[in-house]
């Protein structure tokens, strides 16, 4: 376990431990395939680097909230971290066509078939990452204070 943690020396290497480059290659392939199926005259070729930039923008947008997506690129309140990563038109085009699975090989019984490959790959990667099991259960920590959502549980071992 220590060897793996030592090689994860940066945030980016930890990110790629969960979201490997093969996943981005597969998403780029599926997105390009979908683009060719929907608009064969002018297909939108997606590169792996574009997807990494897209995910970086989405992650940053999930932390810094603005009312509209275009606000991240606006001249008045624009966020430099996002504007330097990719242009707004490229972001919105990629957002409209991103695909994780081929629609032709869809399993109609699976409600999540459109994102199933993404879920499976991330679960597989998370199972490979070692972790320490540090857990503090509520019942181990006695609490005598008051709280609005506190419930009386008569069989709780620590009261």
Where in this protein do the model-derived segments appear?
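N-terminal initiation segments
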Residues: 1-159
């Amino acid at each position: 376990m220590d060897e793996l943690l030592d090689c994860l020396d940066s945030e980016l290497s930890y990110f790629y431990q969960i979201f490997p480059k093969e996943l981005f290659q597969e998403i780029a392939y599926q997105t390009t395939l979908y683009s060719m199926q929907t608009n064969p005259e002018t297909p939108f070729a997606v590169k792996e680097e574009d997807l990494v930039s897209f995910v970086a923008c989405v992650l940053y947008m999930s932390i810094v909230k603005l009312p509209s997506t275009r606000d991240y690129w606006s001249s008045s309140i624009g966020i430099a971290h996002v504007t330097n990563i990719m242009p707004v038109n490229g972001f919105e085009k990629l957002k409209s066509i991103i695909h994780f699975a081929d629609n032709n090989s869809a399993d109609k019984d699976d409600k999540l078939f459109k994102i199933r490959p993404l879920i499976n790959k991330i679960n597989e990667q998370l199972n490979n990452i070692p972790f320490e099991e540090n857990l503090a259960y509520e019942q181990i920590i006695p609490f005598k204070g008051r709280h609005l959502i506190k419930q009386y549980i008569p069989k709780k071992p620590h009261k």
